[in-house]
Amino acid sequence: QLRHLRNGNDLQGLLKVLEMAYQPAIQDAFDFLTHSFPNKIKEPAFRHELLVHPIDSHVHKELIAMEYYERLGSYVKNHLIPAELYLDCSSPQLYWDALAPVIATMRHKHGPASYENFEYLVVRALDWDARFPSGNYPKNMRRLVLPPPISE
């Protein structure tokens, strides 16, 4: 019965995290990271804004995504949600790579603890990917047949 309660709590925690990812501000931040950030980070004025205090998160929406992953990493590190449940359906390392220059800047300004929970989450994700390089699909489960991929 205790295991059943624990599994229910794990599921509730994961559902809350997944719900957070669909909040408008978070979605906007991830859209910014995907579409605008790669060009914005090349602009000297945009990079300079990271050196001032406070940083405008309406302009630097990447900070919202970084805080999301920082919070999520803390939940995983403190066992509020099981890493396996989260890592089976997410790849935070893709965003870490894009955000590494910003994280390095924040650590230079504020110390090595800045975004350490985000880093923890990414290390766990990299370990997960090394453990399951072809995915985590059950070995004895049949696979569905897909049509040929779309071509140009």
Region spans (language model):
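Membrane-proximal alpha-helical anchors
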Residues: 1-46
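Short, charged, low-complexity loops and linkers
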Residues: 45-53
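An amphipathic alpha-helical interaction surface
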Residues: 55-152
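Short, solvent-exposed segments of well-ordered alpha helices
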Residues: 5-8, 12, 52-63
